[in-house]
């Protein structure tokens, strides 16, 4: 991982969009600071596409799509995307894949199994807002659990046939062949006519993240950036970002904003 200051200057002028995780990338200790929100606003005002790509639930994403200075949002680790149509005064929601008919019953049963088997974890406080996935809290509203406990949660989800990803606060599991990257690719193609397979296209986007569930995005985008706390995960990252900020969490995102806008 190179320091963000090594980002080539030509990236700034060619850039058309910024994709970003939310928890511990935009937020700091669970709060969205004024500076981080203002950074989003500045990027959007500069004419860049701004799209959060998050593990947070549908209920939150509806609010984000409507009220934040963004061009859309990918939620629940790729289960759907949302985009607000101001003229029509509605939020367009596109779900990815066909969920199993008994999904909710399976999610409920697995949640009970995990909560019994892994002491100290809890159902995420935002689970009631979710449509497609199961979120187990290992760090947000509970005393942080050791790595072995997090791994045990992942194993149980995978044994149940789920895909499982670790964020900075939750372990998320879902039934379906999608993730943050696959849904981002589809959203950009269908909503903005952007093919990330076109020559040079992915170099026109920056992704900012902080944790293992961002690894597909880190590995795909050549100009991926980790805020400094990404280093806390060490070798648990399947792919690491190309660049890393000096600041942690929201301060790191502000740093990315400053660097990108300085060159435009």
Task: Name what the model sees in each region.
Residues 29-126:
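Active-site phosphate-binding/coordination module
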Residues 8, 13, 33, 174, ...:
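Mg2+-dependent phosphoryl-transfer enzymes with acidic/Ser/Thr/Gly-rich catalytic loops
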Residues 18, 43, 50, 73, ...:
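Short, well-ordered beta-strand core segments
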Residues 68-69, 77, 160, 220-221, ...:
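Short, structured coil segments at secondary-structure junctions
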Residues 110-220:
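Conserved acidic, metal-coordinating active-site core of Asp-based
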Residues 1-20:
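Non-catalytic pre-domain segments flanking phosphatase-related domains
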């Amino acid at each position: 991982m190179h320091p963000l200051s090594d980002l080539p200057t030509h990236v700034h002028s060619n850039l058309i969009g910024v994709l970003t995780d939310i928890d511990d990338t935009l937020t700091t200790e669970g709060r969205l600071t004024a500076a981080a929100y203002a950074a989003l606003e500045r990027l959007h005002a500069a004419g860049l596409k701004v799209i959060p790509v998050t593990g947070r639930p549908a209920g939150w994403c509806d609010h984000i799509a409507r009220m934040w200075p963004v061009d859309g949002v990918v939620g629940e680790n790729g289960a759907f995307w949302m985009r607000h149509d101001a003229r029509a005064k509605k939020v367009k929601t596109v779900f990815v894949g066909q969920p199993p008919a008994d999904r909710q019953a399976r999610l409920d049963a697995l949640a009970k199994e995990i909560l019994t088997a892994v002491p100290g974890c809890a159902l995420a406080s935002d689970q009631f807002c979710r449509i497609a996935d199961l979120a187990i809290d290992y760090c947000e509203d509970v005393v942080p659990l050791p790595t072995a406990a997090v791994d045990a949660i992942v194993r149980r989800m995978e044994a149940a046939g789920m895909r499982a990803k670790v964020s900075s606060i939750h372990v998320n599991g879902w039934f379906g062949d999608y993730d943050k990257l696959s849904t981002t690719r589809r959203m950009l193609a269908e909503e903005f006519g952007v093919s990330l397979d076109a020559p040079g296209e992915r170099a026109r986007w920056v992704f900012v993240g902080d944790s293992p569930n961002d690894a597909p995005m880190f590995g795909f985008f050549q100009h991926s950036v980790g805020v400094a706390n990404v280093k806390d995960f060490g070798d648990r990252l399947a792919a690491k970002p190309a660049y890393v900020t000096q600041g942690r969490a929201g301060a790191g995102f502000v740093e990315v904003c400053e660097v990108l806008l300085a060159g435009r």
